[in-house]
Amino acid sequence: MSTLFIADLHLSVQEPAITAGFLHFIQREAIHADALYILGDLFESWIGDDDPEPLYRQIAAALKSLQQHGVPCYFIHGNRDFLLGKRFAVESGMTLLPEEKVVDLYGRKIVILHGDTLCTDDADYQHFRRRVHNPIIQKLFLWLPLRFRLRIAAYMRNQSQQNNSGKSQLIMDVNPHAVVETFERNSVSWMIHGHTHRPAVHTVELASTTAHRVVLGAWHVEGSMVKVTADKVELIKFPF
C-alpha cells in the first residue's frame, strides 16, 4: 500500500520526453497506488479549460484511467496552472483541493501544498500571486478570446523568466518562519511540497517536536516522486 506525490512536471508540447515519462509513470507506477496527489505545475501554463490543445486531452485521458482503475487523483494548483478548473477536473477524474490540505495517510498526518506560499521573501511574486488569484481578475481573463489569452500567457512567461534571472536564489526559496508557521498552524510534523525545484528532505525543529519537510523535484531530465507507506516517506528520483 502506497500513496504517491508528484509536482512540477511543467508539461508542454515543447517537451515530449517529459510527457512520455509521465504517461509511463501513470501506467507503471500510479495505477498500482492507493492514490496520486499532484501538487501543482502539472502544466507549464494553463489559460483555461476551453483550450483545445491535444496534449491536454491526452493527459486528461491518462489521468481518467486512474479513476477507472479505482485510484483517486487529487490536484493542488501551482503557480503555472492556477486557472485549471472544474471542467478539466471532471474530464480527467481529478479532485481539486484547496491550496493547503492536511491528509492522514497510514496514521501519519501530512500537510501538502504547492509551496509558493512559503516563499514569502519574494515580495514581488507574492504581490503578483495575490493579484492573479483575485476571482474577478481570473473571470475577466477567462472571458477574453483564446488567442488573446495565449499572447498574454506568453508575455507573462517571458517576464517571469526575466524577473527570476535577476533574483537571488535565497529569496526564491522558502522562508523558514513561514515553514514553521505552516507546521504549527496545521498541528502536523510532516510536509510535502514542490515549487522550488530543490528536492530534499529537511528536518525542522518545532517547539515540541522535530518535523520533516519533503521537497519534490521538477521533472527536467528525470522524474521525481514521494512515496508514502505505513513504514516510511521516501523521496525517489527515476528515469523517464
Swiss-Prot record:
Give the co-factor note.
Binds 2 Mn(2+) ions per subunit in a binuclear metal center.
Q: Per UniProt, where does substrate bind?
A: N79, R80, D122, S160, N164, K167, H195
Q: What is this protein called?
A: UDP-2,3-diacylglucosamine hydrolase
Where mainly located?
Answer: membrane
Query: Which Gene Ontology cellular component annotation is one that this UniProt entry carries?
Result: cytoplasm
Q: Name one GO biological process term.
A: lipid A biosynthetic process
Give the gene that encodes this protein.
lpxH
Quote the function comment for this protein.
Hydrolyzes the pyrophosphate bond of UDP-2,3-diacylglucosamine to yield 2,3-diacylglucosamine 1-phosphate (lipid X) and UMP by catalyzing the attack of water at the alpha-P atom. Involved in the biosynthesis of lipid A, a phosphorylated glycolipid that anchors the lipopolysaccharide to the outer membrane of the cell.
Q: Where are the transmembrane segments?
A: none
EC number(s): the record gives 3.6.1.54
Which PANTHER family does the record cross-reference, listed alphabetically? UDP-2,3-DIACYLGLUCOSAMINE HYDROLASE, UDP-2,3-DIACYLGLUCOSAMINE HYDROLASE-RELATED
Record-linked NCBIfam families: lipid_A_lpxH, PRK05340.1
Q: Which cofactors does it use?
A: Mn(2+)
Part of which pathway? Glycolipid biosynthesis; lipid IV(A) biosynthesis; lipid IV(A) from (3R)-3-hydroxytetradecanoyl-[acyl-carrier-protein] and UDP-N-acetyl-alpha-D-glucosamine: step 4/6
Molecular function per GO = manganese ion binding; UDP-2,3-diacylglucosamine hydrolase activity
Membrane topology is: Peripheral membrane protein
Annotated source species: Yersinia enterocolitica serotype O:8 / biotype 1B (strain NCTC 13174 / 8081)
One Pfam family recorded for the sequence: Metallophos
Keyword Cell membrane assigned: yes
Q: Where does Mn(2+) 2 bind?
A: D41, N79, H114, H195
